[in-house]
Amino acid sequence: MSNQLIYTGKAKDIYSTEDENVIKSVYKDQATMLNGARKETIKGKGVLNNQISSLIFEKLNAAGVATHFIERISDTEQLNKKVTIIPLEVVLRNVTAGSFSKRFGVEEGLDLKTPIVEFYYKNDDLDDPFINDEHVKFLDIANDEQIAYIKEETRRINELLKDWFEQIGLRLIDFKLEFGFDKDGKIILADEFSPDNCRLWDAEGHHMDKDVFRRDLGSLTDVYEVVLEKLQGLK
């Protein structure tokens, strides 16, 4: 049956469609932190995230990155290829910030000589623990070849994103990606890309991402609107 709720997430609800290989993602006006411990409804956030993520994924598709994105069909909805999500949060860091700075006792804002890729086990009950390649294999999440591909693809995506954000005066600090297996067993980029799952700083070091919500720095939607407007000006 179509339009049946498949999954309710922190920022999106997922529905079935008439095509068994296609799902509908509906973006919500909800901001969360501490793995959902703090929740707040922020009017307009869903529309902005859908627009930003759709724009980024369209550009990634055009650049030859295999993604789940098909098309945006309304202000808050988009169609995606159905995937089996790999239970990994793949984090790439260009600059020290957030939990990385806390974990290693270093100040925020230090450029990393080489971008660092980290894995976190997607498990709410365990609070998404930081894991390494050996843990990934032990948990039977991915094999050596798949791990290498995910890392390589994440680094390739990073180079594209860094260039695009640099063109609009924003510094890409870090971001989180999720991947999944499509119907043919191919690993493709899934989930979303928005200021919800990346850190962006402007030339003055102002936060242009969900840290505005996490750190009570002002209006989240005002910041997201600026990011969207800048992205819409990309050539």
UniProtKB/Swiss-Prot annotation:
A Gene Ontology biological process noted in the UniProt record is: 'de novo' IMP biosynthetic process
Q: Which CDD domains does the entry mention?
A: SAICAR_synt_PurC
Q: Pfam families per the record?
A: SAICAR_synt
**Lineage top rank: taxon:** Bacteria
- An example molecular function term from Gene Ontology annotations: ATP binding
This chain's protein is named: Phosphoribosylaminoimidazole-succinocarboxamide synthase
For the keyword Protease, the answer is: no
PANTHER family membership: MULTIFUNCTIONAL PROTEIN ADE2 (PTHR43599), SI:DKEY-6E2.2 (PTHR43599:SF3)
Q: Species lineage, top-down? A: Bacteria, Bacillati, Bacillota, Bacilli, Lactobacillales
Q: In which pathway does it act?
A: Purine metabolism; IMP biosynthesis via de novo pathway; 5-amino-1-(5-phospho-D-ribosyl)imidazole-4-carboxamide from 5-amino-1-(5-phospho-D-ribosyl)imidazole-4-carboxylate: step 1/2
Alphabetically sorted, this entry's keywords are: ATP-binding, Ligase, Nucleotide-binding, Purine biosynthesis
